[in-house]
């Protein structure tokens, strides 16, 4: 189900708010304080696209809802005593009721067609990263984090696998976090006691992906990790010496090119 809320609602909402405030039969309207707030909120609920649509319009006075229209009910209903004369008045006006009942099509289904391409059909692929919370040590408690970020829509499935088998115990999730830019993120953590040679995999399924994304993390001993770091350090050091050597070589070449043979006129 999809819910779209529009603060302020349709032109019909604005018209009825004006009628509600100015209509003499409503004694409470004449006694309103100098400063008050009237809000109308229109909500469209969609199931299976536009197969089933429900329209709800809420009228709020100073943060308290007092009357609403629900398309499933087909008429206005008072929420508080303040809304009772309003509901009775509007339900007695055939034109207003017919327009509200038609709003499911003229407002909800219409707007769905306008915004469907960049809301309902919008797809953004997630970025997946796996990392431990502590410096890796075998046979000690650790926490693996699978960070899934920047995806839309919010429906997503994240699983942890150990050596190809799904892990369910020790899995903790933050739940969906809104990034504020129409994308989401989620952190799914797995409690582990890593053993040498074990492979942990974070598997992500999302509507934007044609196939699941998997990111692996391998448990390594301290010696293996030290060897890997030494290898990386040696590689970087080798690149540094190569860069220095090339710099000296090209500088010397430039110096030789500036010399001229003896006796050559310039």
Curated annotation (Swiss-Prot):
It comes from the Eukaryota. Glycans are attached at residue 48. Residues 251-266 are cytoplasmic. SMART domains: IGc1, MHC_II_beta. CDD domains: IgC1_MHC_II_beta_HLA-DR. Residues 126-214 form the Ig-like C1-type domain. GO terms for biological process: adaptive immune response; antigen processing and presentation of exogenous peptide antigen via MHC class II; peptide antigen assembly with MHC class II protein complex; positive regulation of immune response; positive regulation of T cell activation. One of its GO terms (molecular function) is MHC class II protein complex binding. Its main location: membrane. InterPro entries: Ig-like_dom, Ig-like_dom_sf, Ig-like_fold, Ig/MHC_CS, Ig_C1-set, MHC/Immunoglobulin, MHC_I/II-like_Ag-recog, MHC_II_a/b_N. Residues 1-29 form the signal peptide. It is a single-pass type I membrane protein. Gene3D superfamilies: Class II Histocompatibility Antigen, M Beta Chain, Chain B, domain 1, Immunoglobulins. Residues 30-227 are extracellular. SUPFAM superfamilies: Immunoglobulin, MHC antigen-recognition domain. Belongs to the MHC class II family. This is DLA class II histocompatibility antigen, DR-1 beta chain. It comes from Canis lupus familiaris.
């Amino acid at each position: 189900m999809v819910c779209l809320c529009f603060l302020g609602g349709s032109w019909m909402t604005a018209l009825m708010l004006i009628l509600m405030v100015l209509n003499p039969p409503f004694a409470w309207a004449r006694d309103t304080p100098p400063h008050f707030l009237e809000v109308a909120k229109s909500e469209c609920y969609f199931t299976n696209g536009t197969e089933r649509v429900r329209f709800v319009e809420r009228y709020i006075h100073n943060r308290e809802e007092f009357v609403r229209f629900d398309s499933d009910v087909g008429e206005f209903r008072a929420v508080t005593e303040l809304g009772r004369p309003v509901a009775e008045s509007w339900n007695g006006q055939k034109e207003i009721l017919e327009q509200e009942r038609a709003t499911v099509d003229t407002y909800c289904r219409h707007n769905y067609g306008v915004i469907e391409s960049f809301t309902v059909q919008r797809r953004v692929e997630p970025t997946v990263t796996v990392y431990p919370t502590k410096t890796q040590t075998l046979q000690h408690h650790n926490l693996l984090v699978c960070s899934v970020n920047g995806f839309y829509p919010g429906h997503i499935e994240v699983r942890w696998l150990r050596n190809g088998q799904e892990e369910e115990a020790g899995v903790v999730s933050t739940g969906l976090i809104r990034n504020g830019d129409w994308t989401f993120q989620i952190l799914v953590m797995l409690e582990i006691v890593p053993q040498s040679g074990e492979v942990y995999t974070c598997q992500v399924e999302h509507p934007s992906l044609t196939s699941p994304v998997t990111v692996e993390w391998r448990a390594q001993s301290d010696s293996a990790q030290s060897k890997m770091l030494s290898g990386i350090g040696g590689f970087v050091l080798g690149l540094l010496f190569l860069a220095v050597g090339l710099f000296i070589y090209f500088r010397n070449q430039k110096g030789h090119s500036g010399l001229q043979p003896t006796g050559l006129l310039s």
